[in-house]
Amino acid sequence: MILEVKDLKTYFFTDKGVNKAVDGVSFGLKKSQTLCIVGESGSGKSITSLSILRLIEKPGKIVGGSIQFLGQDLLQLKEKQMQKEIRGKKIGMIFQEPMTSLNPSYTVGFQINEVLKIHHPNLNKKERLERVVYELERVGIPHAGDKYHEYPFNLSGGQRQRVMIAMAMVCEPEILIADEPTTALDVTIQAQILELMKELQQKKGTSILFITHDLGVVAQIADEVVVMYKGHVVEQASAKELFADPRHPYTKALLNAIPKPGKEYRKKRLETVDENVDYLSFPKELR
């Protein structure tokens, strides 16, 4: 395992009480594998990904568990070590909305360049420029040399997301965490971004932790799937097993809620996840 999360607990302490956003989550990610964490909004999947990089802000706090990465527990590292050795260098992250993740005051080239400055200070200015342009070309940005000098608001949504992927991949990290990277994109651009991520993975052997609520996306890219509900893992299985034989009632409810093609389904009411059912009362299904 390149990454092993054990009994992770991330709580938010508010005036209204304690919100156990992530409560005892465990899973492992193998080298060159794509693992999808799936669940409805509020299930704790994004908080899990932010916890791995220790990006939890107050009133949130990681209160327990361990995150083993290449033999070291990330929760035991000092903040300086996380900044210099882990974030961006060994573990890259693509956030959900590139327009809020990219700084509108700086060109996209400058922002990718900054990542190289921090993690590869041995590169000179010319080498960094060449590396950034190469990375923009690799993610399919046309006229990459010109786009280097563009500001984020001058690019399309698809191009901004490609810039985010370039920024996350420029240091060739061991793991790429993608938090709902295609949610704000149309179906065509979404397919292109997913294909791009698969290509980059095949070329570099990168492990991908993909956060999504879209089971259609999961079917396209996942090797392994972790299903989360209210801060807990309720089922884990290979993608093939999960879609062929879902065992936990919550997983079944998620799959049943997917709109189905065909005339016989056109007039049928779409199924929903029953909020009155306590899905945590059922045993976990870990295969």
Listing of model-derived features with the role each one plays in the protein:
Residues 62-73:
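Conserved ABC transporter NBD signature motif
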Residues 73, 126-146, 255:
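Conserved ABC ATPase "signature" region
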Residues 142-145, 238-287:
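Short catalytic/signature loops enriched in Gly
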Residues 170-174:
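A short, proline-enriched helix->beta-strand linker immediately N-terminal to the Walker B motif
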Residues 218-220:
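A short, surface-exposed alpha-helical micro-motif characterized by mixed small hydrophobic
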Residues 224, 236:
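Short, glycine/charged-rich "phosphate-handling" switch motifs in NTP-dependent
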